[in-house]
Every structure is written in C-alpha cells, then in structure tokens.
Amino acid sequence: MVAHTRADSAPKPTDPALAGARILVVEARYYDAIADELLAGALAAIEAADARATVVTVPGALEIPAAAAILLDTGAYDAVVALGCVIRGETGHYDIVAGESARALMDLSVQRRVPLGNGILTVETEAQALARARVAEMNKGGGAAEAALGVLALKRMADGARPR
C-alpha cells in the first residue's frame, strides 16, 4: 500500500496563513481599460484573503520583471502579481514582449523563491483581452492573484509558518 498525502494550496478567504501577507502588484497600464479590469480582479482576490496590496505602475509588460525585482530587494513583499496585456500587432515585437516578460517572471519566481502570479495577457485582439480581463467574465487578474496567494500559502506551510 502506498501512502498518499495531498496538500491543497488553494487560498481560502479565511486562510490564516495569508492574513496580513504583503502582495506587490506590478501593473503595466499600456491599455487602461484592460488594466483597470485586471487590477480590480486582483485587488478583490487579495482583499478576500485578508492580505495587503501595494500597487506600482510601469509603462509596459517588459518593465514588470525589473520593477518587481527592484522592489523585492526591499524585503517588504511576500508575493508578486504581474498584470498587463500584450496584443499581437503586425510585427514580431509581440513574440519578444510576450516571451521575454514571461521568462523573466518565471526566472524571478524560481531563483528568488517568491510566489508570483502572472496575469500578463497575451492575445490577438483587444476584444479577447477585455473578455479575459473583465471581473464578470474570465477575471484573469483575480486568477493571477489567487495563483500567487496559493503558492504563498504552500510556501508558508512548507516553511512551517502555517498556524495549526
């Protein structure tokens, strides 16, 4: 017989491991209407977990990883939520921005052991972006925050900081 244990790291609004957590939200506001929806969803998820958010704004998706790294160096944050949108255009710039921002965020998360939710949308059209960003529809901002919170809960459990 094989023993099996499953750790459920999905954040719950009353999870004491998340209370007071300091979440850094780095948003690219290149597309304001999309950014507004992503941010609303992320902030609602963070508030539901009884965590605290600090929001900083950068010009575009490529600036998000550097801004997150700079602010993580302060030691003031437990997790990061990255929010932005890259819409395919007529040149190859989309591929560079989408790929490099995702790679840099993954590197940041793994190398620094920081929980990170990637809410940078990569889409073909603005309509696709709005559908994914809207809180009432796909709520990808909320999903990114929940991902960061879920990994933070898991990290705290692994570090022994979770109340029993």
UniProtKB/Swiss-Prot annotation:
PANTHER family: 6,7-DIMETHYL-8-RIBITYLLUMAZINE SYNTHASE (PTHR21058:SF0), 6,7-DIMETHYL-8-RIBITYLLUMAZINE SYNTHASE DMRL SYNTHASE LUMAZINE SYNTHASE (PTHR21058)
Source domain of life: Bacteria
Family: Belongs to the DMRL synthase family.
Organism of derivation: Methylobacterium radiotolerans (strain ATCC 27329 / DSM 1819 / JCM 2831 / NBRC 15690 / NCIMB 10815 / 0-1)
Gene name of this polypeptide: ribH
CDD domains attached to this UniProt entry: Lumazine_synthase-I
GO molecular function: 6,7-dimethyl-8-ribityllumazine synthase activity
Any one of the GO CC terms: riboflavin synthase complex
Residues binding (2S)-2-hydroxy-3-oxobutyl phosphate: E90, T91, R132
Protein name (database record): 6,7-dimethyl-8-ribityllumazine synthase
UniProt keyword annotations, A-Z: Riboflavin biosynthesis, Transferase
Binding residues for 5-amino-6-(D-ribitylamino)uracil: Y30, A61, L62, E63, C85, V86, I87, N118
EC number: 2.5.1.78
Family matches, as Pfam families: DMRL_synthase (PF00885)
